[in-house]
From Swiss-Prot:
It comes from Acholeplasma laidlawii (strain PG-8A). Its main location: cytoplasm. Its EC number is 2.7.7.23, 2.3.1.157. The active site is at 361 (proton acceptor). Residues 1-228 are annotated as: Pyrophosphorylase. The gene is glmU. It is an enzyme of class 2 (transferase). HAMAP family: GlmU. This is Bifunctional protein GlmU. Acetyl-CoA binds at residues 384-385, 421, 438.
Length: 460
């Protein structure tokens, strides 16, 4: 028998107080629905169906062709959402895993365990439950003396005895397709909200079909994310889980509670990460690197024995033995060579540098190809923008660029060139050249009195 998944993801998420669909909200910079789809893909599920409604094109843009879609134009409850998929799933032999789209921490191994319990016990309808010492806000699982589930009662409808029940409904189910979906049409909406609820299927199925349960051991995996506070709780859980995994694999973290590592980040053993550091995207950090404190790295590669402190690195490569920062900014496919020094308040954009090149402070390198052993003096700028277009700067090997130098692109600087401080260079410089492009200094002795008013003397 095949396994299917049905994710109920049509809601707006009004408690998020945003126009973004709830399931598209980022958790550690990745949309909520991504976590769900990725884990379902890793499980034994063969086909995923998403029920979409509010701003469905946003969710489709995230998931693309990894799922099939059905649409719920009006959001009339979980049962109504499942009805939208019934014409398809009722015809398919097998079982379906049904879950809300706002439970991003569900794990693929848990999904497979749910299927196993469902099949091993011959269940037609398996309700995934959890045990909470404080179950406030959750629907309670009501069982008879034999332990068989009789109904699920929402807290607002529960009596005093039922409110004391600590086993709750997670909103996650495994169902036999033909039996469950054929009965959905019998659901009614005789309730205060006029909505259809999957929980009412217990009443429809308990007489003729087998209802069972699976109690999830880690309640966090079934945590619903309905507001921004819940997003912070989900991020905290994921942060602790991810950081622990890296530390057990040999990554040193100082104050790990202040460090955020994305799901796709690869960090080799022997890396040290200092406080207040965020590493996301498809980033790779190699052994011996030291990152942070106060550093952001996204979609980048940090090679062995690189040090990045108090800096931003986006979509870039930093090669072996280089130091970056403090307060440097690498972006837009910067490729920093081996044993470079990119110092404080230096920005490198869409540029590459060769071995042993240094820009120690207050420099901008943009749209440039820079050779080996180049020294950028303080205040050096590659002037790449003419007001309409960006232009390229090419700098050879063994070039000395004096302080406060402007290189007006497009321009080529040859090998073994020396550029005097304070120059504005507008023409190419050949190999072994010396360039000075500034006005000659004129000094007039005893002349400042004509320009500066004398300060009055203080009275003794």
């Amino acid at each position: 028998m095949k396994n299917y998944a049905l994710v109920l993801a049509a809601g707006k998420g009004t408690r998020m107080k945003s126009d973004i669909p709830k399931v598209a909200f980022p958790i550690l910079r990745k949309p909520m629905i991504e976590y769900i789809v990725e884990n379902i893909e890793k499980s034994s599920v063969e086909e995923i169906y998403l029920v979409l409604g509010y701003k469905r094109e946003v969710v489709e843009g995230i998931v693309k062709d990894r799922a099939k879609y059905v649409y719920q134009e009006e959001q009339l409850g979980t049962g109504h959402a499942a009805m939208m998929a019934a014409p398809v799933l009722s015809k398919l032999d097998g079982n379906t895993f049904i879950m809300p789209g706002d439970v991003p921490l569900i794990w693929y191994k848990s999904i497979d365990r749910m299927f196993a319990v469902h099949e091993d016990n011959g269940n037609d309808f398996t309700i995934v439950t959890a045990h909470y010492e404080d179950p406030e806000g959750y629907g309670r699982i009501v069982r008879n003396e034999q332990g068989v589930i009789q109904r699920i009662v929402e807290e607002k409808d529960a009596n005093d005895f039922e409110k004391e029940i600590k086993e709750v409904n997670t909103g996650i189910y495994i169902v036999n397709n033909k039996k469950f979906f054929s009965l959905l049409k019998n659901l009614n909406n005789n309730n205060a909200k006029g909505e259809y609820y999957i929980t009412d299927m217990v009443e429809l199925m308990k007489k003729d079909y087998k209802i069972g349960s699976y109690m999830i051991k880690n309640n966090s995996l079934a945590m619903g994310v309905n507001d921004l506070y819940a997003i912070s709780k989900a991020e905290k859980y994921l942060r602790e889980y991810i950081n622990k995994d890296h530390m057990l694999n040999g990554v040193s973290m100082i104050n790990p509670e202040t460090i955020t590592i994305g799901h796709n980040v690869i960090i080799e053993p022997g890396v040290t990460i200092n406080p207040n550091t965020t590493i996301t995207g498809d980033t790779v950090i190699k052994a011996g690197a030291i990152v942070g404190p106060n550093t952001e790295i996204h979609n980048s590669r940090i090679d062995s024995h690189v040090v990045v402190r108090h800096s931003l690195v986006y979509d870039s490569i930093v090669r072996e033995g280089t130091t970056v920062g403090p307060f440097a900014h690498l972006r837009d496919h910067a490729d920093i060579g081996t044993h470079n020094r990119i110092g404080n308040f230096v920005e490198v954009k869409k540029s590459s540098t060769g071995h042993n090149t240094k820009a120690s402070h207050l420099a901008y390198i943009g749209d440039s190809v820079v050779g080996e052993s180049v020294n950028f003096g303080c205040g050096s700028v590659t002037v790449n923008y003419d007001g309409k277009l960006k232009h390229k700067t090419e700098i050879g090997d063994n070039v000395f660029i004096g302080c406060n130098t402007n290189l007006i692109a497009p321009i080529k600087i040859g090998d073994n060139v020396f550029i005097a401080a304070g120059s504005t260079v507008t023409k190419d410089i050949p190999d072994n050249g010396f360039a000075i492009a500034r006005s000659r200094q004129v000094t007039k002795e005893d002349y400042s009195k004509y320009l500066i008013s004398p300060k009055p003397k203080k009275e003794e």
